[in-house]
């Protein structure tokens, strides 16, 4: 009997609840139903707000539905699967643990059961592009790759289709990592900067959650860290296996680095020149960093020729400085992934001229002062919306250099109005970028929906 069969045998008489009846959880729910598990499908939405077909199919398959605002209260189950974005310390989940209920997640169980090598990426910025690059490198090299975590598809439902020679590549958030007790074979941390402080109790809690990606590794694991980032560099004391640094600013002894315009890799001080950074199709110096990160993760698995081929062809990921259209000489870009100041700074640096920027959104209780000097240098018109608009404006106006920089700051009611204002003020040769520096939850369920709406608005001009 294999590990998967043993797992399902161990929970055969357990009641298992899944939080959220969304597209990412449904394959997982049906996997457990098909294995004869007593499943409770839970969602904060009322039945009327959920697709009728989904509700009907779940009931027909034998799932019990627990719906509405109080769906987590007094759950009479043995195991709860929380969603990737659900706070581990949610009072209802704490109460469940106090009552002896097991609280876990798809990724935790997947790591326990996965038969193949795993590569996981976390960080405050650059996770998705780096994860996608790693998967693209490996696929181009000929590996069968399973992409999951925060991107791709749920991997636990397809666990029986994964072979030991495959490679699983996953993106992990701090919310997922905070409770994980198993680390991947290759851990990657892009950087760590203040983020999600509306959910994490302290910055230290956020940092420790990120560090959890590597603390359960063994001597035969690889850890890839950003030596240019003070916090990630500090993680080196917890590395148990091969320590690999990458750097945009300095040469390293073991890892990828930039030497002038040349991307290089030092393998125990033996340096290989890989390519000129100008070979990279993606715009922006932050994407050079993403390549340094991804190369450090796959070195020894992927040939240099494969790396160069991908660099020349890879067009990027949706919502990440994504070109939308050119209208009357004005270029529009969708950078909705910029949910933090550091991410917006990277987006601003990708262009060699001053921009018209659409910013603002949900308040994650992170400071905007670090954004201010870059905004003064790179933004000519800033159109702000959402709960953070005033805080962003205050940080910029109080920054040295604001007086005389010529920046115009405008407040709008919503994204529609922001696009209208940008369209009215932009002149031929201008660049308009949605780069909010904030999460989307004040108006959209996620940054993807915000980005899609922006593209719809721009394409309808």
Show which residues each predicted segment covers.
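Phosphate-binding loop of NTP-binding sites
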Residues: 30-33, 72-75, 84-227, 231-241, ...
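C-terminal helical cap/extension that packs against the catalytic core
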Residues: 55, 371-429
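Beta-strand->loop->alpha-helix junctions that form or flank phosphate-binding loops
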Residues: 43-44, 66-69, 104-108, 240-258, ...
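N-terminal leader/targeting and accessory segments in enzymes
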Residues: 1-105
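Short beta-strand "acidic-cap" motif of Rossmann-like dinucleotide-binding folds
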Residues: 39-43, 147, 169, 245, ...
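Short internal beta-strands
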Residues: 38-46, 223-227, 358-359, 378-387
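Nucleotide phosphate-binding/pyrophosphate-handling subdomain across enzymes
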Residues: 3-15, 25-35, 144, 275-379
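Residue-level signal for inorganic ion chemistry
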Residues: 32, 80, 121, 150, ...
